[in-house]
């Protein structure tokens, strides 16, 4: 399978950060805004922990098969590709140093184009044909929702899906392990920021599926805490760029801000539609939009000022040890590697999974892997801490807000 990445170009001064939330489990030391570009460009390499090995690679031992279904083609492909690249940077490093208990890691990634029926067929193949030990790095709420019955039936762990949906958190799902913060936490942060800025007329654009419904519910809840309701609500079909009607509908309510719950193809199209109508509303996206993909889809300064909530550290801040490690291994994988929030999330998720696999022992089963996750003490990946336990599989509540500029970050 071809490995693909995105190009970012950096220009100092375009990033703003506000309202950092450490959460109850995740802590991150963020330096002042004006130092971030300098650190990204000039901070010397920080000595990093090497990928751990619990023994030399033994070629006669069976591989540890990790199964992933994600969009690797189609309108939302960059999300799946970037997550996979970040994860592979760590998995390949582990394999170079002997694997896990002498066993090589093999990530099998199947393309679902962000369409639930394909996710279902891919998952059956991963479980029945490929004999995956664990499902890892699935992308999207509607796609993950479609395979939850298989997860429950086969009792296979689903680790670090790229979704903050409530349905993976409430009620508790014993086979689902969430790394990222919930969409509720993200929307709470952005609504609090908008209200503090005096923007009370808040509209919502949502994807017409499980993801959009979850984000819409979260926005209602966040606004309700301030005694507010959405001034207008419009929907858009998944993967669609036909957003002119939705823009006109919201524009009639004269919103001062719009919370957008969609992937980057629809979000970018809607941003162009709304700007074309002369709106000055502040646009806010949840992290699933894919920051780099959104910037790529809005060239020439069209993305300037758009807000995006983030659930991982800033990928260019090498003062955070795990970010420096991520950059080093990404460069080792590919000369001139591009960094980004989604690939960093994949990298962090891969590190979390291998820590549990090490703890599960030389002959891991699905049950042993679950026990290993739940039995781990707080895991500090190097400035990004994760903690779960029996009855609570939410590892991080970290949320940060970023605002895009006319130039893209880079590399």
Q: Each predicted region: which residue ranges?
A:
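Segments of small-molecule ligand-sensing domains
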Residues: 332-344, 354-410
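Extracytoplasmic "Venus flytrap"
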Residues: 50-86, 110-116, 139-140, 205-212, ...
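N-terminal export leaders
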Residues: 14, 24-28
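Short, solvent-exposed amphipathic alpha-helices that sit
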Residues: 79-96, 118, 158, 186-189, ...
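Periplasmic-binding protein-like
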Residues: 126-139, 159-161, 203-206, 254-264, ...
């Amino acid at each position: 399978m071809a490995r693909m990445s995105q190009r970012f170009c950096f220009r100092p001064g375009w990033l703003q950060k506000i309202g950092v939330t450490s959460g109850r489990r995740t802590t991150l030391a963020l330096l002042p805004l004006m130092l971030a570009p300098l650190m990204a460009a000039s901070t010397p390499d920080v000595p990093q922990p090497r990928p751990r090995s619990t023994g030399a690679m033994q070629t006669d031992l069976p591989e540890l098969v990790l199964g992933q279904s994600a969009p690797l083609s189609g309108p939302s492909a960059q999300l799946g590709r970037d997550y996979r690249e970040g994860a592979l940077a760590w998995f390949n490093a582990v394999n170079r140093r002997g694997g896990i208990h002498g066993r090589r890691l093999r990530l099998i990634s199947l393309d679902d184009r962000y369409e639930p029926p394909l996710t279902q067929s891919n998952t059956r193949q991963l479980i029945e044909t490929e004999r995956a030990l664990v499902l890892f790095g699935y992308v999207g709420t509607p796609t993950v929702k479609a395979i939850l019955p298989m997860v429950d039936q086969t009792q296979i762990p689903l680790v670090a899906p790229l979704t903050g949906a409530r349905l993976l958190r409430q009620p508790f799902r014993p086979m689902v392990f969430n790394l990222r913060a919930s969409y509720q936490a993200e929307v709470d942060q952005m609504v609090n920021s908008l209200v503090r800025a005096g923007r009370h007329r808040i509209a919502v654009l949502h994807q017409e599926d499980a993801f959009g419904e979850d984000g819409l519910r979260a926005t209602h809840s966040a606004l309700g805490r301030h005694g507010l309701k959405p001034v207008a609500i419009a929907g858009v079909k998944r993967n669609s760029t036909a957003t002119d009607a939705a823009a006109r509908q919201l524009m009639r309510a004269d919103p001062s801000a719009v919370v957008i719950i969609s992937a980057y193809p629809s979000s970018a199209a809607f941003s162009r539609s709304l700007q074309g109508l002369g709106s000055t509303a502040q646009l806010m996206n949840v992290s699933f939009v894919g920051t780099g993909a959104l910037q790529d889809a809005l060239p020439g300064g069209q993305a300037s000022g758009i807000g995006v909530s983030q659930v991982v550290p800033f990928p260019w801040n090498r003062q955070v040890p795990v970010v420096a490690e991520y950059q080093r291994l990404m460069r080792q994988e590919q000369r001139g590697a591009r960094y980004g929030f989604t690939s960093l999330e994949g990298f962090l998720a891969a590190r979390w999974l291998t820590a549990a696999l090490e703890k599960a022992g030389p002959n891991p089963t699905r049950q042993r892997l679950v026990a290993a996750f739940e039995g781990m003490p707080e895991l500090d990946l190097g400035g990004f801490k994760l903690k779960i336990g029996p009855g609570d599989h939410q590892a991080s509540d970290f949320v940060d807000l970023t605002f895009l500029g006319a130039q893209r970050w880079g590399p």
